[in-house]
């Protein structure tokens, strides 16, 4: 993988990991357009740039993370259902690794955002700070997050939708989603390395790995800060519309044969 491609994929990862638009869908698009082979080094590269994204969340929210034990307990409770469900259903997920599933979930998630925003129009939110989130609500968010195991759903999208349905205001829903990404992504990455320890031994081209890591970190920091400011003033409808448009783009690419709904998707 060349340095320029590493830079581009790092940007894609940083831009889409925490926006509710499906980072998986964008990585499919990016690797296909760039003509990158999905080999062992690519898998190692993906792990490294995801670590950059995780570090970005810690960097942005470090004050909240060190305010006390309460937030860590809530994140642990939130991760629990995702971890349990993931452990038991992971081996059955290959059946969902299909481009048409991505299409369906992109469009479905977009419609959900639009419907929820219309339903919440002029309504008062019940939860307006992280401190007000109950352990029961944190657990429910974890259940929603587990839906992101379905390709095209978006981890942040699923958990944010869960928060909105539970009465969180937009900013709190997004903040808890971002914070919940820390244990979720760290453990998911560790599990990937445990299953395929050779992935680290394949990471022998340090320059593209470093470029991807730093780029993903910097872009993710900027995106998180921008996103939180954006949703403090606006709603999620633009993201819903974007998801629907992207879903139809994928529909066209798969239907026309430009992309293979099976093999092209298996990242």
Swiss-Prot record:
It comes from the Bacteria. Its EC number is 3.6.1.27. One of its GO terms (cellular component) is plasma membrane. One of its GO terms (molecular function) is undecaprenyl-diphosphatase activity. It holds the Pfam family BacA. InterPro entries: UppP. The chain crosses the membrane at residues 1-21, 41-61, 69-89, 96-116, 173-193, 207-227, 239-259. It is a multi-pass membrane protein. It catalyses: di-trans,octa-cis-undecaprenyl diphosphate + H2O = di-trans,octa-cis-undecaprenyl phosphate + phosphate + H(+). Keywords: Antibiotic resistance, Cell inner membrane, Cell membrane, Cell shape, Cell wall biogenesis/degradation, Hydrolase, Membrane, Peptidoglycan synthesis, Transmembrane, Transmembrane helix. It is found in: Cell inner membrane. One of its GO terms (biological process) is regulation of cell shape. Bacitracin is thought to be involved in the inhibition of peptidoglycan synthesis by sequestering undecaprenyl diphosphate, thereby reducing the pool of lipid carrier available. Catalyzes the dephosphorylation of undecaprenyl diphosphate (UPP). Confers resistance to bacitracin. This is Undecaprenyl-diphosphatase.
